[in-house]
Amino acid sequence: PTRRPVARWPRWPRKSPSGADPDTLTAQEIKDRIRDAGIVGMGGATFPTHVKLSPPEDKKIDHLILNGVECEPYLTADHRLMLEDPDNIIGGILILKKVLGVEKAIIGIEANKPDAIELMTKACAGRGIEVGALKVQYPQGAEKQLIYALTGREVPSGGLPMDCGCVVQNVGTAAAVNDAVRRGIPLIERIATVSGSAVNEPKNLRIKIGQPLGKLVEFCGGAKGELGKIIQGGPMMGMAAVSLDVPATRGTSGVLLFSEGQVLKEPEGPCVRCGNCVRACPAFILPTEIAFKTKK
């Protein structure tokens, strides 16, 4: 139900006086426009995009990775964006390629989105952009896992994607970059999924940054039943919100509402060192040791 078309209302003018043809701009001028427009990572981390596009001179970047995986349950905002506005995404990718000086760009999309894979593959034809269909598993959208899945490269322990020649950006970030550079539109809105068991009419919405979450839920038919949990973002990596009066931010990829009966409230039990968390960890760390040391 959350894969419905994006609900729309009047937007910023599609082209403002501050928009420019990226072909007439230098890489630094483009980065300045991205910075001035307030563009950040739209996947949820909200790391400043212009900083990510400025690796040290000794770090040779040869791959631009676009994250269209969206592996968090319930969230389908990036999916809808790829289906409804692929040209905006591709325009942003071409700008990012110019800034980084790379020839290789790959969009990673999970195989459970065949419509997006097909559409983006056709839209990218002849533009130096590839689409990689990835196995459906969590956390496929995490930077290190995504880089390994698409390139076979491993980010060094304690390192960053730039240490293996890659820069990763979300597809929503690419679209925002295109809006900022070509049209002069700052980051004042984004696509977000409003869903969960306690939402009457789950939808994807184009939301204004700063709108109270309650207004978004109201647009989706309101909440039903007693609310047990409100989450900004996905159920795995999102942040709990104290109330629906909290404003949406640039990192609000979703607003999830769950009923009281769906929220697990069991007390924490002792670790019996069964090893299940170690086997499940995609980064091969030892969660048991982390838990033990935090309690010490």
Where are these regions (language model features)?
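Metallocofactor- and cofactor-centric catalytic cores in central/energy metabolism, strongly enriched
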Residues: 38, 45-46, 50-56, 78-83, ...
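Gly-rich Lys/Arg/Thr-decorated short loops/hinges at beta-loop-alpha junctions or inter-strand turns
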Residues: 64-78, 198
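Histidine-anchored nucleotide/phosphate-binding helix
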Residues: 83-99
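Hydrophobic alpha-helical positions that pack around
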Residues: 103-213, 219-224, 234
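Ferredoxin-type iron-sulfur electron-transfer modules in oxidoreductases and energy-metabolism complexes
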Residues: 253-268, 276-296
